[in-house]
From Swiss-Prot:
This is Heat shock-related 70 kDa protein 2. GO terms for biological process: chaperone cofactor-dependent protein refolding; male meiosis I; male meiotic nuclear division; negative regulation of inclusion body assembly; positive regulation of G2/M transition of mitotic cell cycle; protein refolding; response to cold; response to heat. Coiled coil: none annotated. Residues 2-389 are annotated as: Nucleotide-binding domain (NBD). InterPro entries: ATPase_NBD, Heat_shock_70_CS, HSP70_C_sf, HSP70_peptide-bd_sf, Hsp_70_fam. The keyword DNA damage does not apply. The N-terminal nucleotide binding domain (NBD) (also known as the ATPase domain) is responsible for binding and hydrolyzing ATP. The C-terminal substrate-binding domain (SBD) (also known as peptide-binding domain) binds to the client/substrate proteins. The two domains are allosterically coupled so that, when ATP is bound to the NBD, the SBD binds relatively weakly to clients. When ADP is bound in the NBD, a conformational change enhances the affinity of the SBD for client proteins. Residues 397-512 are annotated as: Substrate-binding domain (SBD).
Length: 639
């Protein structure tokens, strides 16, 4: 381990996240405080506090407009982005534009606040970091974070920024399927050699990813990636929600559509039913008072669920075919098929995939929800120099998800780096001028597979000026594309005759956060964290006062004490307890020190009487934070 403690692997998912750590030669997937090994990627804001994870998801029905999820669909994108615009129609929370970047708008502690997607993701990452710290019993400083294979440059960079805001040193951003392959490679280590082609089929809550990798002698190489950013478990839930909402309308002549809370409760029940249907052939749904006081009791069979989603399930095979084409492989050449993502538990999806591969066995040995975090944890251990033999000879080669190039005369896309090129990589090509005496060139950097740049995605542009006058075609301008291991791109253009050069790191034009923005967000994240802690302390002080008061009350009312305590003393304590209970009812939101002050006040009245009761005891001693023992905390201490 490094001097700074272990590094963790975080699978930052669209709907759920997962964290793992590699120690003592194996990976531990870490459960959260609710005992769950995956945590919802949800953040909620209320009048009094900020909630993250299970607590946020559990209150979504009561607070839909201030509960944020799907931040991963916004991260690194522009507000105008067509996918952002279409996603916004489905979200109960508000998305606004600031300088062309999307921000979510919420009411928090009575004020309107806006947050960048990076900030929301950083809150989820903070939760994952805290889960790991609670388990490891110390601070965590470094992490590997995973992203979908086809995240572009700005989405990767924004994810890295989210990690920075959290206060993590992001060792590397790696592709989710690559992480799953590492998990798998580690599982399969020690198999007799040769090159292995592996297909990773990753169907999660919100996204679908197919990747083909070759594994040989501990080296992973990604051959191709394909998928659908908008297919996953939530889509299957939605089909069931629509179906059952129709059924409710038929039975009860009521449309729950406009009622967000009813729809949300139905969706929660559908998600539960869907999970049940992976292991049973029927699931029952019971929702009390779903809408206008009407209960909804029904059931759904696995067959009906499969029929509702038939086209979506079948559609998962298209990206499989595309990935095979891109990798120039026949399906018979795939040695291993690995299932990743909770939705791969659906029996029908497993059957379709198995049939497509002519009955080949699927690998389900790794828990599909945890495989990505598992691999990220292994990669984190490698990067901080873990010397365990289990990870010693593992090398990781990632690829660029899209071709990268520049625009040349006539709006033509000229790629310098082809898609699926292993990274890190560096490519240089020489270009020249288009007209006589041209003194500058505009270098426009694009990503995409189309022949014309107008159909591709502009990443950034810059000018190279000061080219000495010369006939067209004479100057030699050398353009270099350099991608580092995180998939972040530097483009340089240099005039060979003068040595003059200009460069761009492809981030800023894509709405990358500035250094100042990140610093500000780091401070804000700290502030929110300390506010959360202060709130926890406040609640703890309130609970301590409450349990102390009730314990004392119970103690003096105890039959066994009859005759040991005077009526006067007893009433003095009971009156004071009642006064505190009344005060508590009126002051649920008081500050920590007010609760502590009240407790001291109560102790001042009670301690002398209680110590008289247990003669010879040293009167006093604080009643110490309500241990909840039936005899009351003071007594335990005095005894």
């Amino acid at each position: 381990m490094s001097a700074r403690g272990p590094a963790i692997g975080i699978d930052l998912g669209t709907t759920y996240s997962c964290v793992g750590v590699f120690q003592h030669g194996k990976v531990e997937i870490i459960a959260n405080d609710q005992g769950n090994r995956t945590t919802p990627s949800y953040v909620a804001f209320t009048d009094t506090e900020r909630l993250i994870g299970d607590a946020a998801k559990n209150q979504v029905a009561m607070n839909p407009t201030n509960t944020i999820f799907d931040a991963k669909r916004l991260i690194g994108r522009k507000f105008e982005d067509a996918t952002v615009q279409s996603d916004m129609k489905h979200w109960p929370f508000r998305v606004v534009s600031e300088g062309g970047k999307p921000k979510v708008q919420v009411e928090y502690k009575g004020e309107t606040k806006t947050f960048f997607p990076e900030e929301i993701s950083s809150m989820v990452l903070t939760k994952m970091k805290e889960i790991a710290e609670a388990y490891l019993g110390g601070k965590v400083h470094s992490a590997v974070i995973t992203v979908p294979a086809y995240f572009n440059d700005s989405q990767r960079q924004a994810t890295k920024d989210a990690g920075t805001i959290t206060g993590l040193n992001v060792l590397r951003i790696i592709n989710e399927p690559t992480a799953a392959a590492i998990a798998y490679g580690l599982d399969k280590k020690g198999c007799a050699g040769g090159e292995k082609n592996v297909l990773i089929f990753d169907l999660g809550g919100g996204t679908f990813d197919v990747s083909i990798l070759t594994i040989e002698d501990g080296i992973f190489e990604v051959k191709s990636t394909a998928g659908d950013t908008h297919l996953g478990g939530e889509d299957f839930d939605n089909r069931m929600v629509s179906h059952l909402a129709e059924e409710f309308k038929r039975k009860h002549k009521k449309d729950i559509g406009p009622n967000k809370r009813a729809v949300r409760r139905l969706r929660t029940a559908c998600e539960r039913a869907k999970r049940t249907l992976s292991s049973s052939t029927q699931a029952s749904i019971e929702i009390d008072s779903l809408y206008e006081g009407v209960d909804f009791y029904t059931s759904i069979t696995r067959a009906r669920f499969e029929e509702l989603n038939a086209d979506l399930f079948r559609g998962t095979l298209e990206p499989v075919e595309k990935a095979l084409r891109d990798a120039k492989l026949d399906k018979g050449q795939i040695q291993e098929i690995v299932l990743v993502g909770g939705s791969t538990r659906i029996p029908k999806i497993q059957k379709l995939l198995q049939d497509f591969f002519n009955g080949k066995e699927l690998n389900k040995s790794i828990n599909p929800d945890e495989a990505v975090a598992y691999g990220a944890a292994v990669q984190a251990a490698i990067l901080i120099g873990d010397k365990s033999e289990n990870v010693q000879d593992l090398l990781l080669l990632d690829v660029t998800p899209l071709s990268l190039g520049i625009e040349t005369a006539g709006g033509v896309m000229t790629p310098l780096i082809k898609r699926n090129t292993t990274i890190p990589t560096k490519q240089t090509q020489t270009f020249t001028t288009y007209s006589d005496n041209q003194s500058s060139v505009l270098v426009q950097v694009y990503e995409g597979e189309r022949a014309m740049t107008k159909d591709n995605n502009l990443l950034g542009k810059f000018d190279l000026t000061g080219i000495p006058p010369a006939p067209r075609g004479v100057p030699q301008i050398e353009v270099t594309f350099d991608i580092d291991a995180n998939g972040i791109l530097n483009v340089t253009a240099a005039d060979k005759s003068t040595g003059k050069e200009n460069k761009i790191t492809i981030t800023n034009d894509k709405g990358r956060l500035s250094k100042d923005d990140i610093d500000r967000m780091v401070q804000e994240a700290e502030r929110y964290k300390s506010e959360d802690e202060a709130n926890r302390d406040r609640v703890a002080a309130k609970n301590a006062l409450e349990s102390y008061t009730y314990n004392i009350k119970q103690t003096v009312e105890d039959e066994k004490l009859r005759g040991k305590i005077s009526e006067q003393d007893k009433n003095k304590i009971l009156d004071k307890c009642q006064e505190v209970i009344n005060w508590l009812d009126r002051n649920q939101m008081a500050e920590k020190d007010e609760y502590e002050h009240k407790q001291k006040e109560l102790e001042r009245v009670c301690n002398p009487i209680i110590s008289k009761l247990y003669q010879g005891g040293p009167g006093g001693g604080s009643g110490g934070g309500g241990s909840g023992a039936s005899g009351g905390p003071t007594i335990e201490e005095v005894d």
